[in-house]
Amino acid sequence: MEEFKGYLQKGGFKQQHFLYPLLFQEYIYALAHDQGLNVNASTFNEPPEISGYGNKYSSLLVKRLITRIYQQNSFIYSVNNSKQNRFVGHNKNFYYKMISEGFAIVVEIPFSLRLVSSLKEKKEITKSQNLRSIHSLFPFLEDKFSHLNYVSDILIPYPVHLEILVQILQCWIQDLPTLHLLRLIFHDYHNGSNSIPPNKSSFGFSKDNPRLYRFLYNSYVVECESIFDFLRKSSSYLRSTSFGPLLERTHFYGKMKHIGVTCCNDFQKTLWLFKDPFMHYVRYQGKCIMASKGTHLLMKKWKSYFVNLWQCHFHFWSQPSRIHINQFPHFSFYLLGYLSSVPINPSSAKSQMLENSFLIDSFTPKFETMISIIPMIGSLAKAKFCNLSGNPISKPAWADLSDSDIIDRFGRIYRNLSHYYSGSSKKQSLYRIKYILRLSCARTLARKHKSTVRAFLQRLGSEFFEEFFMEQEKVLSLILPRTSYPLHQLSREPIWYLDIIRINDLVNHFDL
């Protein structure tokens, strides 16, 4: 970030809010590829006077590529003379890919600088570093969701028209040449497709340049959430103390204060419909959850609001079937690898008054998180640790490693999964995962030594795996003091860690 500031101040672009000249700076493309300026320009089929210019991403090369993008007639000429000019076909997409990679770096600069300045101004965010952990979301859900009645499971709709994305970025980028170039990249790269995520014919955009794709998608989501946050704050007469820090966790980065004044005029007449002080919103991947303590009628009003917002503000049809309204005791949802629900747990208490004794039955809702074993087995099968039935198999790709490396890899996978799923209310599924990985490790070692699993374990002993497949109880005994709760009782309680900043790869296979 300090490098960006230096480059901006050096070129005078920061004061003028011009991003377009940065596209001609060679260091931008070096940052995009995280490598030195050593890319051969002859790869792009350029003439000798350009390809010999330092054999790198040169400003002359980039200028010529952008000029070709603007000259629409040259595309038709190139198709008719494809044998002489290799700009058509995959080369055309390669040119767009190169420009879009640098473009992704450039458009992130004003947002990154604004984020740094907002973090310096807001001291309360710097004190909440633990909110970076994925597990920090679940204590919030445990505290809030057990007291709510209804929940809406919303699938964020797409595709979004490309022109809508450009209009969204106009609120943040006041550089018309940059926005015009973005339009050209959209319409030419997608071969006529006007939406993102694109259709199958142009789906490569999200794969070829995931950085720009994530930036555009997050811009669209932030626009939706900005309007929703404005409406929620305007309609709520009791503020939630946990909502402010949660904004940082969901990557709003303080952008809510920049909502346009037009929103006030558009929604002023409808605010009276949404008087609810207990509205909570959580977004994860392509879905979001909106929970409330209100009535079913109130949730239907919010559903109608979202459908009208997507139709009127983003100009595309959104099926009402994307929004499901459920009551919490009958609703479960996948969230970051966990199957979460709020079941009602019955309990009885004996009370005695004089000579009469009687039982008092009570029902208490409790937020629970469990491991969904069937998707997890499918993920392990995809990684070649077992078959689809959950039977462990050997890992032939690791048979060439040393014994210690093989055991260390299997043990590290289990420890990471055990660490990630430490918040599960029921640990039986975790023991099943441990069994699969341990036996898969034994089969891999037996395959390497051309022996059977039984003979291999008899020769080394079953204790050979213990130090690598250390159970969570043993880890907790090394961390927690002896005066804490008994380990058998503590192992049944969910434990949330504050050092998990990304989803486990095996979890990410099925959590879509």
Swiss-Prot record:
Keywords on record: Chloroplast, mRNA processing, Plastid, RNA-binding, tRNA processing
GO cellular component terms given for this protein: chloroplast
Compartments in which it is found: Plastid, Chloroplast
GO biological process, one term: mRNA processing
Gene Ontology terms for molecular function: RNA binding
InterPro entries, sorted: Domain_X, Maturase_MatK, Maturase_MatK_N
Pfam families: Intron_maturas2, MatK_N
Its biological purpose: Usually encoded in the trnK tRNA gene intron. Probably assists in splicing its own and other chloroplast group II introns.
Family: Belongs to the intron maturase 2 family. MatK subfamily.
Descriptive protein name: Maturase K
Organism (species): Lemna minor (Common duckweed)
Protein encoded by which gene: matK
